[in-house]
UniProtKB/Swiss-Prot annotation:
Gene3D superfamilies: 5' to 3' exonuclease, C-terminal subdomain (1.10.150.20), 6.20.10.30, BRCT domain (3.40.50.10190), DNA ligase/mRNA capping enzyme (3.30.470.30), Helix hairpin bin (1.10.287.610), Nucleic acid-binding proteins (2.40.50.140). It comes from the Bacteria. It is an enzyme of class 6 (ligase). Its EC number is 6.5.1.2. Residues 601-690 form the BRCT domain. The lineage of its organism: Bacteria, Pseudomonadati, Pseudomonadota, Betaproteobacteria, Rhodocyclales. Keywords: DNA damage, DNA repair, DNA replication, Ligase, Magnesium, Manganese, Metal-binding, NAD, Zinc. This is DNA ligase. Its cofactor is Mg(2+); Mn(2+). NAD(+) binds at D35, A36, E37, Y38, D39, S84, I85, E121, R144, E180, K297, K321. The keyword Transferase does not apply. Belongs to the NAD-dependent DNA ligase family. LigA subfamily. One of its GO terms (molecular function) is metal ion binding. DNA ligase that catalyzes the formation of phosphodiester linkages between 5'-phosphoryl and 3'-hydroxyl groups in double-stranded DNA using NAD as a coenzyme and as the energy source for the reaction. It is essential for DNA replication and repair of damaged DNA.
Amino acid sequence: MPLFADAAARAATLRAEIARHNHAYYVLDTPTIPDAEYDRLFRELQDIEAAHPELLTPDSPTQRVGGAPLPELVPVRHAVPMLSIRTETDTTAQGVRNFDTRVRNALGLGDGDPAVEYLSELKFDGLAISLRYEHGVLVRAATRGDGETGEDVTHNVRTIQQIPLRLHGAAPAVIEVRGEIYMRRDDFEALNNRQREAGDKVFVNPRNAAAGAVRQLDPRIAARRPLSFFAYGLGEHAGFDLPATQAELLTRLAAFGVPVCEHREVSSGPEGLIAFHDRIAALRNELPYDIDGVVYKVNRVDLQRELGFVTREPRWAVAHKYPAQEEITRLAGIDVQVGRTGALTPVARLEPVFVGGVTVTNATLHNQDEIDRKDVRVGDWVIVRRAGDVIPEVVGPVLERRVGEPPRFNLLASYPTCPVCGSHVVRGEDEAVARCSGGLFCPAQRKQALLHFAGRRAMDIEGLGDKLVEQLVDASIVKTPADLYKLGILALANLERMGEKSAQNLLAAIEKSRNTTLARFIFALGIRNVGEATAKDLARHFGSLDALLAADEGALQQVPDVGPVVAKCIAEFFAEAHNVEVVEQLRAAGLRWEEGAPAAPASGSVAGLTFVITGTLPTLSRDEAKALIEAHGGKVSGSVSKKTDYLVAGAEAGSKLAKAQDLGVDIVDEDGLRRLLESGEQSPINNKDGVPE
């Protein structure tokens, strides 16, 4: 290595450097290096740890996601109970005065005594968590549970980028950081968009999505849900000099690199608390996360001890929630918004109504099925709620106030073409969501289309990440994937966090991507329901892009594993002239791949057989095993089903193994796979009951 002959020293340096960049990016929101440079550092650390496994440490950034799913969540007893905070029943300013009066009476303070000093914080709508650090390293994360006993969720919490795996600076022997795991609203919306895109159930609100992620048995599921964290207190600690005030404690936690909310304020007496409450009420709609109130705490720790607890609630703290947020108004019309995945979402246009401190004029109606289920019609009086305490939602109509029989809203009849780009709008038979078919062309879908196109398994354009794509699209430098191949050094070098060197690296990566394969190119187009495996099947079957473009639904269904739904998605994609125009622009930009005659029927020792790979194989990576199977005519799927012929199981095989056993799928290990590929016959030591010993 250029700077360190000692791999251990270099690994330690990389871990510290990556941790600093993570803290700057995820906690401070002030990125310090380009994405491509961060990726380079991360890969270098991965390479060192792969070559020297003995250097792997639990606080390494490479270890945030990993390991097999757990069989169950293990109970954890809290050394210091995680108690709940009393909720003030009076949501008005009088509720604040009631709390202050109780505190003063408990402390024996009279009218002539000084005002009590308080710290005001936000009441986050998330999941309470306890993070235990020993000598600075995160060793356990546990849910609140019943306050006495929670559940060990360390495997999932390690995937949260905001939570440091190692504390900054000189850390105490033991410190348990208490706080809230939550999901930002924009992350929640993006997650639900992905759920809709995959045909999966959407989440009701960010809190449910966050809580469900934290309690998953498989950390890979949690890693796919973008979670955040704020600290607000302390549990057990040893070797830690406890500050004199709650405010100082939060400052100390922030110095350890733990995220602490900036919206907090020290004040004296009830009037300061009331002012904070009202100021946050006016601000809450602009916050990037959900809150359902504020929390007041006596600031001095010695007074907290003196006040103590009553019925397992601290006397020195109270939650002050905001009032209920439902009102009635008239539905003036229904508009449509096009999301980044092409989903058309109906939006209620409302007569202005004041709900929970803000004036609401629009609210989500989700999709056609929800409109039908709620029977909401233009002209109705409707109940409006700020769902999740933030996002306005139409709950339903007030039927007794309906006049006559207003017509029902039909999205496809009202919007046969995309309101953004004019492409055809389509909706699958069993799908709730209608979509714009102009995926490569539609401005609303540009960012998502570009990120998918540049992905590692698509065109593999290294360095083209979220932030850069956002800049390129917002500055109107790139409108379609074809525009990437027109980029020059001047246009890139002027972008934020993109110097001349980074620009040259990106241009080199774009140039390298011109030489690809037909399968990668098809996958990069982002055709709905066309994954990597289907793209390979299409490339193999048709042999050329022109043959694919000319295929109708009937011809497409001749491709192995392409059924009516996928065939319809492909046909609709290429029936949209805007998409074909971008495809031709990409060809004109010099993208190249080998083409040939349509493939003959698959041959080889496992031709026509479907495999699923799970667990860690002794000598083969999953990609290597997949390539071997495909080279012998087989196909690799990502999930076990009745159509699966063989499950290739390695160490720490997860839920796929159990499902394969339930379905009676043949199970082989790596040796069994090699024998199968060589002879086409299953080894007699492998069977449907499990992996051979």
